[in-house]
């Protein structure tokens, strides 16, 4: 299962969807496409990106939040949340912002 966690100005993604065998997993491809498609924009706008090579994991964190950066991260979060609602057995989505 892919685990997506959203906290104040931060998104963390980890795990595998296991929707289908390697190379045919459309759920994993969709999540990866959203996140990795946005990475160049995030990296050019001073967002801290951390990857863990030992496990499939990635964190995006707004170092100096601005309205532009918050909007960009919000768009990515909304896309991922939509996928999680469509594939709840393969993607967990935890929004910790409501607890802050």
Curated annotation (Swiss-Prot):
Domain of life: Bacteria
Documented EC number(s): 3.4.22.-
Catalytic residues, chain numbering: 16 (proton donor), 28 (nucleophile)
GO biological process: proteolysis; ribosome biogenesis
Keyword Endoplasmic reticulum applies: no
UniProt keyword Metal-binding present: no
Any one GO molecular-function label of the UniProt entry: cysteine-type peptidase activity
Alphabetized UniProt keyword annotations: Hydrolase, Protease, Ribosome biogenesis, Thiol protease
Stored Gene3D superfamilies: Cysteine protease Prp
Signal peptide region: none
Pfam assignment, any one: Peptidase_Prp
CDD domains: Prp-like (cd16332)
Biological role: An essential cysteine protease that cleaves the N-terminus from ribosomal protein bL27.
Family per similarity comment: Belongs to the Prp family.
Protein name from the UniProt record: Ribosomal processing cysteine protease Prp
Phylogenetic classification of the source organism: Bacteria, Bacillati, Mycoplasmatota, Mycoplasmoidales, Mycoplasmoidaceae
